[in-house]
Amino acid sequence: MAMNIRKTHPLIKIVNNSLIDLPTPSNISIWWNFGSLLGLCLIIQILTGLFLAMHYTADISSAFSSVAHICRDVNYGWLIRNTHANGASMFFICVYLHIARGLYYGSYLNKETWNIGVIILLLLMATAFVGYVLPWGQMSFWGATVITNLLSALPYIGDMLVQWIWGGFSVDSATLTRFFTFHFLLPFVIVALTMVHLLFLHEAGSNNPTGLISNMDKIPFHPYYSYKDLLGFFILLFFLTFLALFTPNLLTDAENFIPANPLVTPPHIKPEWYFLFAYAILRSIPNKLGGVLALAFSILILLLVPILHTSKQRSLTFRPISQLLFWLLVANTIILTWIGGQPVEQPFITIGQIASITYFSFFLILFPIAGWWENKMLNL
């Protein structure tokens, strides 16, 4: 009898082992859908980005006009632009839910997969930041100026590093050109790292809601989870289409409809909504270098989570104290996001400082203590 080609062909075999015959735990919930949704978001962003790049001009004299030209004169340019802009928001919603799932169910104990995931997150944030500069509106220009200028806080090399990134003594045409280059290049680096992420994941196998080893109860990925993922795709595409067609500017800043003007500073300089929690942490520290370090550490702290895991149980499913802390962390992050969008005045300054301290306390102090306490309670 002839062997099935999907199991013998060198290339198709890889796809088969990753998407068809992959042994998958039988009890993984909808929270495991976000990995595939992120893959869909990445494909949508790359495709819409390629079509936008065909019509975009990376020069300060014509960048703003070229975006207007895309929306007004290019066939379905408005749809491509709206899908790309709102696709970034959907991407970050899925990323944050994916990370939250990993924290809740202890997926971070698969260390290689988790660490690659954190690197992907950093690259994703870099891609989104440089992409936000490209329309060359007021918030694009001032956001680029403020955030890149933070690097000048680094001792010895700071000023040189900022001028090197700017390509001059201010954010100018050279800056825009290199930011466009990075925005074009980085998604493909993310694709490569996603492959590595999946490689490490399939090396160890997926986690499941109980956090227990599920080798004795696995089912093939197709048809069970492939159809489940398709349902997720339709739901995501519905929300993305709704955003792009009905409220395309819901999540954008009105300031960005004004062409960049170095002589006029916007009343409130703030990034897109998905960076506001980190921006709030940055602003809550009066010292410039301290703020930059806190900003970096707000993301890099995820690398410490596997090291600080003290519980005998992997998942939070049977750990009520840690569950409470987890949801308090979620609430705290939402508060930080709200504070990041508010002006720098009381009471927002104090709330931001308290929320920043508690954000780091959850990871460094409260979760390890809760894990240790729950271990003690198991022995009662």
UniProtKB/Swiss-Prot annotation:
Binding site for a ubiquinone: H202
Subunit structure: The cytochrome bc1 complex contains 3 respiratory subunits (MT-CYB, CYC1 and UQCRFS1), 2 core proteins (UQCRC1 and UQCRC2) and probably 6 low-molecular weight proteins.
Binding site for heme b b566: H98, H197
Cysteines engaged in disulfide bonds, as pairs: none
Species lineage: Eukaryota, Metazoa, Chordata, Craniata, Vertebrata
Family to which the UniProt record says this protein belongs: Belongs to the cytochrome b family.
Listed name of the protein: Cytochrome b
Subcellular location: Mitochondrion inner membrane
Membrane topology: Multi-pass membrane protein
Superkingdom of origin organism: Eukaryota
Keywords tagged on the record: Electron transport, Heme, Iron, Membrane, Metal-binding, Mitochondrion, Mitochondrion inner membrane, Respiratory chain, Transmembrane, Transmembrane helix, Transport, Ubiquinone
Cofactor requirement: heme b
GO BP: any one term: mitochondrial electron transport, ubiquinol to cytochrome c
Other comment: Heme 1 (or BL or b562) is low-potential and absorbs at about 562 nm, and heme 2 (or BH or b566) is high-potential and absorbs at about 566 nm.
Pfam entry (one): Cytochrom_B_C
Note accompanying the cofactor annotation: Binds 2 heme b groups non-covalently.
Role this protein plays: Component of the ubiquinol-cytochrome c reductase complex (complex III or cytochrome b-c1 complex) that is part of the mitochondrial respiratory chain. The b-c1 complex mediates electron transfer from ubiquinol to cytochrome c. Contributes to the generation of a proton gradient across the mitochondrial membrane that is then used for ATP synthesis.
Membrane-spanning segments: 34-54, 78-99, 114-134, 179-199, 227-247, 289-309, 321-341, 348-368
GO cellular component, one term: respiratory chain complex III
Entry's Gene Ontology molecular function annotations: metal ion binding; ubiquinol-cytochrome-c reductase activity
